[in-house]
Design a protein with these regions (language model features):
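Structural loop-to-beta junction motif characteristic of Rossmann-like glycosyltransferase folds
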Residues: 113, 135-136
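Active-site-adjacent beta->alpha loops and helix N-cap segments on the catalytic face
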Residues: 92-111, 120-128, 139-150
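Active-site-proximal glycine-rich helix-loop-beta segment
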Residues: 84, 134-135
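Conserved N-terminal beta1-alpha1 strand-loop-helix module at the mouth
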Residues: 1-115
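A short hydrophobic/small-residue beta-strand
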Residues: 87, 137-138
Length: 150
């Protein structure tokens, strides 16, 4: 198995564990109760050829064990928002990045910008989960098979 395949298998196993606690049907219903998604298109399209910035809340990376200073992801997102990004990306993958859906909740509650959930999405469950936690956008990896949403 490649390292990417291992990461995908880990992401699937983690999603399956969460699904055993909160069934897909209940999560799907929760995702429908979230206020409408904020469109990122207006902020991504610029007429002045300026670079569009997507700020990222991330606790760690595979290279750096700890990105100190992310004690409050919501507060960090507020600082980012003051700089005028088009969106805020929140790394939610718990494995090597120490992200979480709680980080997504905190950022969603803190800013009125489009919020992107950044995780290795391998199941439809994760799509509904991200939306239920307030994500407006979702990062999908082109190396994975297309998801069929249920």
């Amino acid at each position: 198995m490649t390292s990417f395949e291992v990461m995908a298998a880990d992401a699937r196993a983690a999603a399956d564990r969460r699904a055993s606690r909160v069934p897909l049907a209940r999560l799907r219903e929760s995702s429908r109760l979230v206020p409408g998604a904020i469109s990122a298109l207006p902020s991504l399209r610029t007429d002045d050829r300026a670079v569009t910035v997507i700020a990222e809340v991330k606790r760690s990376t595979a290279t750096f064990a700890d990105l100190s200073g992310v004690g409050d992801p919501g507060m960090l997102a507020c600082f980012y928002a003051a700089g005028g990004p088009a969106s805020v990306s929140v790394v939610t993958g718990p494995s090597s990045t120490r992200g979480s859906l709680k980080d997504l909740d905190a950022v969603r509650a803190a800013v009125d910008l489009p919020v992107l959930a950044n995780d290795l999405v391998v199941t439809p469950y994760q799509v509904h989960e991200a939306r239920a936690h307030g994500a407006d956008l979702l990062m999908l990896d082109a190396r994975l098979e297309p998801l069929v949403l249920e």
